[in-house]
Regions:
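Acidic, small-residue rich beta-repeat scaffolds with periodic aromatic anchors
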Residues: 23-27, 105-171
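Repeated scaffold domains used in trafficking and secretory/extracellular systems
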Residues: 96-102
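Acidic/hydrophobic-patterned starts of short beta strands in beta-sheet-rich repeat architectures
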Residues: 37, 49-62, 104-114
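Beta-propeller blade repeat segments, especially FG-GAP/WD-type strand-to-loop junctions
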Residues: 69-88, 126-129
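Classical Sec-dependent N-terminal signal peptides that target proteins to the secretory pathway
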Residues: 1-21
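Short glycine/acidic-enriched loop and turn motifs that connect beta-strands
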Residues: 63-68, 116-119
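Short loop/turn motifs that cap or connect beta-strands within the blades
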Residues: 90-93
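Short N-terminal segments immediately surrounding and downstream of signal-peptide cleavage
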Residues: 20-43
Length: 171
């Protein structure tokens, strides 16, 4: 009964977010992993962790049965805000040869993407936290072969609605 109530509540209110009832699925092993157990799971590699004002960002990679990098989906990112996890299943879809990194500066989370032949393009996304949510605020083209730096402002897009594969290299 409790699970049914939480399921209905998630469709009405939280849309992609539930603290303890959302699972990550390792695409190589098809293993369901509770978000509470991600950091201790043997098929998950913690690549990076960033902390700002009681909010934590975890950048992870999946491992296959042999402990090697999973190439079906290389990366995922989730946040821990007030003991609840915020996770978007579509966040890193179809980012094949992109190498992201998560950091924090002045209470702003930054995701850097390197991609292209010789990783010659770098894009940076700025995320802020407010009222228990994560918002995408702007994007900077840090370096590109065209040599044209560019800044794109977003209107506080909730991270639950972002799919970075649709934002990469759009300028």
């Amino acid at each position: 009964m409790r699970n049914l109530f939480l399921l209905i509540l998630s469709f009405l209110v939280f849309s992609n977010v539930l603290a303890k009832d959302v699972d990550l699925i390792n695409p190589c092993t098809n293993e369901n992993i509770l978000l509470d157990e991600v950091l201790s799971n043997k098929s998950i590699l913690l690549n990076n962790r960033a902390i700002s004002n009681q909010v934590e960002a975890f950048f992870i990679s999946y491992l296959d049965q042999d402990g090697e990098a999973c190439y079906k989906k290389k990366y995922d990112l989730f946040f821990k805000v007030n003991d609840s996890y915020i996770y978007n299943k579509e966040l890193f879809n179809d980012l094949n040869n992109v190498y992201p990194e998560v950091s924090v500066s002045d209470n702003v989370f930054m995701i850097d993407f390197e991609y292209g032949n010789g990783q010659s393009n770098i894009e940076r996304y700025y995320l802020t936290t407010s009222s228990g949510n994560i918002y995408l605020d702007k994007k900077d083209i840090i370096y590109s072969r065209s040599g044209k730096p560019n800044e794109i402002k977003f209107n506080n897009i909730n991270i639950k609605d972002v799919e970075f594969s649709k934002l990469i290299n759009i300028y």
